[in-house]
């Protein structure tokens, strides 16, 4: 189309690379190879990018929300700080940060091109449904970790440093293992394609490496104020927290996205 007024009036004006300069300046999209088939591939890639951007935002807000709940909740009920600022910073950089990075490389989902078109902007990127999911997951995960901290301090009678060390470990592990639930918000974790994103497993490896460094490199251990820790003595408790957290995320997914559909 070389009709400049029509291109300006269209929702998305498309001009050919061989068209006039006036038409190309008036259009939103210029097909350099003069082939309309590239439009489908461009739409598919655009939808994949938006999908992955949503996953990054949802994962970041959900995990950050759980940290706010556990720290704020502990202070409200009169417990000592469950996590120190340095521990939270370490977790956000080495666990949360790497996970967010890996979501950018998620492949497209199977129903991507079967979804209805929708306008996407700053306000539409995270819908009310997604925000409801974020708040629910952040609240449930935060309350789970808060209950763990209350159990460690009140019932087990652990020293503050020992309880904080266990909370630091639990927070990192729940963030790492729950990432698989965020790979596909429209499908349960048992239907998720686990091995489609090698960057995700690289991020998990970096996160575990960061956790080992925190405990094994003495200067960092002192900065984070971590107590001597034997993971085997708390293996059952940590496994239970990880599995319960995944179950809570899956329940929230079922409530907000009960079947394949738009997000």
Predicted regions and their residues:
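Acidic, divalent-metal-coordinating active-site segment for phosphoryl/phosphodiester hydrolysis
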Residues: 1-10
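Hydrophobic residues in alpha-helical membrane-spanning segments
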Residues: 5, 86, 219-220
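Membrane-embedded transport module
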Residues: 10, 18-186
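Active-site-proximal beta-strands of protease catalytic cores
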Residues: 14
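C-terminal transmembrane module of polytopic membrane proteins
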Residues: 169-263
């Amino acid at each position: 189309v070389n009709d400049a007024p029509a291109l300006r009036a269209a929702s998305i004006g498309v001009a050919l690379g061989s068209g006039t300069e006036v038409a190309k300046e008036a259009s939103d999209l210029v097909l350099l190879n003069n082939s309309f088939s590239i439009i489908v591939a461009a739409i598919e890639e655009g939808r994949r990018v938006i999908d992955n951007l949503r996953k990054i935002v949802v994962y970041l807000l959900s995990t950050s929300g759980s940290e706010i709940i556990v720290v704020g909740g502990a202070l409200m009920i009169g417990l000592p700080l469950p996590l120190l600022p340095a521990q939270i910073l370490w977790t956000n950089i080495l666990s949360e940060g790497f996970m967010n990075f890996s979501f950018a490389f998620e492949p497209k989902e199977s129903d991507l091109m079967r979804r209805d078109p929708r306008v996407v902007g700053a306000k539409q990127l995270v819908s009310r449904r997604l925000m409801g999911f974020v708040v629910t997951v952040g609240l449930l995960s935060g309350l789970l970790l808060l209950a763990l901290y209350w159990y460690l301090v009140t019932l087990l009678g652990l020293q503050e440093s020992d309880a904080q060390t266990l909370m630091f470990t639990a927070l990192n592990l729940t963030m790492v293992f729950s990432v698989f639930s965020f790979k596909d918000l429209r499908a349960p974790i048992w239907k998720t394609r686990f091995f489609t994103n090698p960057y995700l497993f690289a991020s998990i490896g970096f996160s575990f490496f960061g956790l080992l460094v925190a405990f094994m490199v003495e200067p960092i251990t002192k900065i984070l104020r971590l107590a001597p820790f034997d993971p085997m003595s708390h293996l059952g408790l940590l496994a239970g927290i990880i599995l319960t957290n995944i179950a809570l995320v899956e329940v929230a997914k079922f409530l907000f996205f009960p079947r394949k559909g738009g997000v």
